[in-house]
Amino acid sequence: MTYLYAKEHKLKINHQSIEAFPVPISKATQLNYTSDFSENEKVVFYQMHQQEWNRGEEITEDFLLTKHLCLLEEFNSPHKFHVIYFDAFSPSEQPELWTEQIFQKMFDLLEDKGVLATYCAQGQMKRNMKQVGFNVQSLPGALGKREMTRGLKAI
């Protein structure tokens, strides 16, 4: 989705992805995610999924992708980020990813005025975000969700 948005708005993107347990390309193709994509967009999608881990690669002239094969807790970066999409499984499935410590890590990884977005809308998760300094906002949900959450790093 980031690639498609960047392409449409002519943005240059340095996209970093953290995956501890990546979906194999054989499973990704079964999701039929690319059914509405152009042929060129399908090529880019498969190129992203087949890219080597832990190494940046220009997917297109304006889209650099680095996939990090590690746990979020282990991830370190000298760079600060504008946006973090936090798409972990729910707090009931992966409670270790919804703690104050994890939100503190993401807060520290964001630039001032950076944004964290998640499909989760759980009350305790929002309290954890607020506790570490996020300005928390509830938003209308996407992809069939009733509500989602945005955290702003306002310093």
Q: Positions of the model-derived regions?
A:
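SAM cofactor-binding core of SAM-dependent methyltransferases
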Residues: M1-Y46
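A short helix->loop->beta-strand "cap" motif at the edges of active sites that frequently abuts
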Residues: L11-I13, L109-G114
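Short beta->alpha hinge that forms the Motif I/post-I loop of the SAM-binding pocket
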Residues: E19-A20, W98, A121
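S-adenosyl-L-methionine
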Residues: K27-P78
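A short SAM/SAH-binding and catalytic strip from SAM-dependent methyltransferases
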Residues: H82-E96
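Conserved beta-strand signature within the Rossmann-like core of class I S-adenosyl-L-methionine
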Residues: V83-F86, D112-C120
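A short glycine-rich, Lys/Arg-flanked "PGG" loop and its adjoining helix->strand segment in the class I
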Residues: E96-D112
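Core SAM-dependent methyltransferase catalytic element
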Residues: V132-I155
